[in-house]
């Protein structure tokens, strides 16, 4: 449970490759970062979904608020390797349809994003964001956060300026693989990226339209 600006909110942290999600073990292990991030935020902001699991997201709000054609394509028709995770647009849309207000920021400069992210976290609200393998500062590809693309959640900012991060994957370089991490914002922003094109696809269909971050707002 986290407390910020006088409010308390309970976030559940999920391990996408825990293999304890019936029917969707393999999908979540391969593609589940977006689903886990959505479950973490939805359960924290809307009491009607308190305790929701990633597998319940797939069979519940994801199925409800995406087209039957798209949902069936990703979870029934395609092979595991060909299946795709929810896009940031898809996450934003499902949250709004589930009563959780948010703003999907697609384009930004690093200086704008740094100020915007810290300011938003200081209100006690979270941010869902995307990173890639390529480091935007050095231009090199690393495995620090992902082998390709990865969705995570920023939960808050500490008094020392570091941010509290919810990651659905264990990483050996951080405290023996702990998924709740305290890191410098710059460590994340070096791997974040803005959109260079616009898409309303509910599922990932290319990095150019899936960058940016989602600012979550308290339900009024």
Feature annotation, model-predicted:
Residues 145-146, 157-220:
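Noncatalytic regulatory segments and standalone regulatory/sensor domains
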Residues 58, 104-106:
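A short acidic/basic microdomain associated with nuclease active sites
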Residues 41, 57, 127-129, 152-154, ...:
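Hydrophobic beta-strand residues in large extracellular and virion-surface proteins
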Residues 1-83, 142:
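Active-site-adjacent structural segments surrounding the nucleophilic cysteine of cysteine proteases
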Residues 37, 41, 45-49, 65, ...:
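Sec/Tat-exported extracytoplasmic proteins
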Residues 109-170, 174:
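Active-site-adjacent substructure of cysteine-protease-like catalytic cores
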Residues 83-104:
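Mid-length scaffold segments of soluble, non-membrane domains
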Residues 34-42, 58, 88, 92, ...:
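Extracytoplasmic/secreted envelope proteins and their assembly/folding machinery
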């Amino acid at each position: 449970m986290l407390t910020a600006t006088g409010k308390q909110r309970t976030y559940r942290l999920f391990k996408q490759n825990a293999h304890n999600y019936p029917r969707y073990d393999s999908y979540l292990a391969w593609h589940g970062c977006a689903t886990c991030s959505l479950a973490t935020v939805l359960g924290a902001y809307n009491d009607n979904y308190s305790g929701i699991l990633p597998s319940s997201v797939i069979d519940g709000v994801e199925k409800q608020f995406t087209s039957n054609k798209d949902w069936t394509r990703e979870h029934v028709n395609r092979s595991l390797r060909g299946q795709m995770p929810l896009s940031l647009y898809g996450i934003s849309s499902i949250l709004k349809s589930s009563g959780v207000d948010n703003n999907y920021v697609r384009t930004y400069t690093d200086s704008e994003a740094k100020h915007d992210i810290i300011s938003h976290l200081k209100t006690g609200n979270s941010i869902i964001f995307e990173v890639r393998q390529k480091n935007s500062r050095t231009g090199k590809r690393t495995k620090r956060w992902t082998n390709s693309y990865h969705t995570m959640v920023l939960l808050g900012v500490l008094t020392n300026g570091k941010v509290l991060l919810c990651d659905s994957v264990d990483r050996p370089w951080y405290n023996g693989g702990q998924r709740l991490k305290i890191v410098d914002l710059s460590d994340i922003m070096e791997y974040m990226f803005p959109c260079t094109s616009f898409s309303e696809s509910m599922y990932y269909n290319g990095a150019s339209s899936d960058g940016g971050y989602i600012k979550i707002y308290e339900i009024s």
